[in-house]
Amino acid sequence: GCPRILMRCKQDSDCLAGCVCGPNGFCGSP
Protein backbone atom coordinates (compact mmCIF):
# COMPACT_ATOMS: atom_id res chain seq x y z
CA GLY A 1 0.00 0.00 0.00
CA CYS A 2 0.83 3.68 0.05
CA PRO A 3 2.42 5.16 3.21
CA ARG A 4 -0.02 7.61 4.80
CA ILE A 5 2.16 10.70 4.38
CA LEU A 6 0.89 13.87 2.72
CA MET A 7 3.25 14.46 -0.18
CA ARG A 8 2.67 16.98 -2.94
CA CYS A 9 3.19 15.65 -6.45
CA LYS A 10 2.93 16.50 -10.12
CA GLN A 11 3.33 12.92 -11.34
CA ASP A 12 3.37 9.39 -9.94
CA SER A 13 7.17 9.31 -9.84
CA ASP A 14 7.12 12.15 -7.26
CA CYS A 15 5.43 9.73 -4.85
CA LEU A 16 6.68 6.86 -2.71
CA ALA A 17 6.43 3.27 -3.93
CA GLY A 18 2.84 2.05 -4.01
CA CYS A 19 1.44 5.57 -4.38
CA VAL A 20 0.06 7.47 -7.33
CA CYS A 21 -0.38 11.21 -7.82
CA GLY A 22 -4.03 12.08 -7.31
CA PRO A 23 -6.05 14.86 -9.00
CA ASN A 24 -5.81 16.89 -5.77
CA GLY A 25 -2.04 17.20 -6.25
CA PHE A 26 -1.19 14.83 -3.42
CA CYS A 27 0.07 11.24 -3.37
CA GLY A 28 -2.36 8.50 -2.39
CA SER A 29 -3.30 4.87 -2.88
CA PRO A 30 -4.02 3.83 -6.49
UniProtKB/Swiss-Prot annotation:
InterPro entries: Prot_inh_squash, Proteinase_amylase_inhib_sf. SUPFAM superfamilies: Plant inhibitors of proteinases and amylases. It is found in: Secreted. It holds the Pfam family Squash. Disulfide bonds join 2-19, 9-21, 15-27. One of its GO terms (molecular function) is serine-type endopeptidase inhibitor activity. CDD domains: PlantTI (cd00150). Its main location: secreted. The record marks 4-5 as: Reactive bond. GO terms for cellular component: extracellular region. Keywords: Disulfide bond, Knottin, Protease inhibitor, Secreted, Serine protease inhibitor. Inhibits trypsin. The presence of a 'disulfide through disulfide knot' structurally defines this protein as a knottin. Belongs to the protease inhibitor I7 (squash-type serine protease inhibitor) family. This is Trypsin inhibitor 2. The lineage of its organism: Eukaryota, Viridiplantae, Streptophyta, Embryophyta, Tracheophyta.
